[in-house]
């Protein structure tokens, strides 16, 4: 089984490299899980004196369910549209984001928990800060531009994990608002995209 899995992974890497050559891609963009395929592509290009695509790799965001459920490959817990409940979909409504983040896995001591990752890689770089607003009887709103300090505040009880999740949901909703507006104004484009992705 292990050898079969390894062969399958190798085939997948070769297929992705072949796609880059076939499509004459100038810039190959993907998560860090695509690095092996991209480096293989560049090695093949060197050996054959073919044009090499420039490769850009982004951080991986964990699925909302986190890494629970036993031993996993390093990228097997990544967010993927194949499980919509485990992922943020670009046209998710504010209500859907709130529902998903409410259920999202959060290990207060793990900086790689998906809630922290979304704050670190999406919300704070885009909006400049993350706002956490508890119910009035539980305190005043706070803003955060440093995820490590935010995580420390959660561990020490200054920020409640639920309030953090709802703050992340609201921040994501703000980040995705222009996309939602675009698809609201152009529903045929959303329909076309859904037909292509099969979702």
Label for each model-derived stretch:
Residues 1-9, 13:
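Single conserved hydrophobic/aromatic residue that forms the stacking wall/gate
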Residues 29-35:
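Glycine-rich ThDP/TPP pyrophosphate-binding loop and its adjacent helix/strand module
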């Amino acid at each position: 089984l292990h050898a079969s899995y390894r062969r399958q992974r190798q085939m997948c890497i070769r297929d992705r490299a072949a796609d880059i050559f076939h499509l004459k891609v100038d810039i190959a963009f993907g998560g860090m899980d695509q690095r092996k395929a991209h480096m293989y592509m560049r090695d093949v290009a060197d050996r054959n004196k073919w044009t090499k695509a420039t490769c850009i790799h982004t951080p991986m965001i964990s699925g909302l369910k986190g890494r629970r459920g036993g031993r996993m490959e390093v990228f097997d817990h990544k967010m993927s549209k194949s499980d919509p409940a485990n992922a943020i979909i670009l046209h998710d409504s504010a209500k859907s984001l709130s529902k998903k983040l409410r259920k999202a896995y959060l290990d207060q001591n793990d900086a790689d928990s998906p809630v922290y990752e979304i704050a670190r890689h999406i919300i704070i770089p885009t909006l400049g800060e993350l706002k956490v607003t508890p119910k009035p009887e539980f305190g005043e709103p706070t803003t955060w531009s440093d995820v490590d300090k935010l995580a420390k505040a959660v561990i020490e009880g200054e920020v409640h994990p639920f309030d953090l999740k709802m703050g992340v949901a609201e921040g994501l909703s703000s980040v995705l608002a222009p996309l939602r507006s675009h698809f609201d104004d152009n529903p045929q484009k959303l329909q076309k995209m859904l037909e292509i992705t099969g979702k």
